[in-house]
């Protein structure tokens, strides 16, 4: 599937997914994949997280997720707020039995009512130093490759490999959380698709929606959990894997991968060679 790709062999898997082509959702031909990003400019890692499922599954997800939100006394799930008991969750005591039970329920809904999940993280400093200069000319006249955009592209490539295998005939509409830079990311995705990268084949469309969409909140949960673990790996803290992430990745169709300094150093010569051989990826001057 990666015969010609800007993203080939970029990272290593913390938890590799088993291909989902034989799973129960094989009969669902048109899916939706929801994508969110965790981490910011002040953090070690940037992580994109995504879940994919068919519309009937997402409808069941919405009912179950809404019930947990109602019991939590909140309207919208933001993982950072929930796990730190602030914002809409400020009335909950951190690590109280109520808090732990709600965490278990949110994770349970994400596990039961999705088909596959993907998270991909990048080491921010290493990306800025090693990869960003190589990608400076890639994109369109209005869209360049940000670290968030590159994490999203790689996350979607994993989704195509493991959740939407080419021989399955399944397709998906991609929904990103609305926010700064997402319009440019969508333009970049359309640009990559127009260039014919095979992993983009199952993706029918790219759009944004507000965080009020429940499936985007599940993507936020996976991005946050991936960000916590991948940051720990990058910083060498050696902490045990969080129970919430352990529960999420017990599902065999969840993939968590990353590219730190070592992985990006190995990837840089491939990327440089690829761009030299494929000048059509470069921005065209405005007329």
Protein language model features and the residues they cover:
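Phosphate-ester processing/binding pockets and catalytic centers
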Residues: 1-287
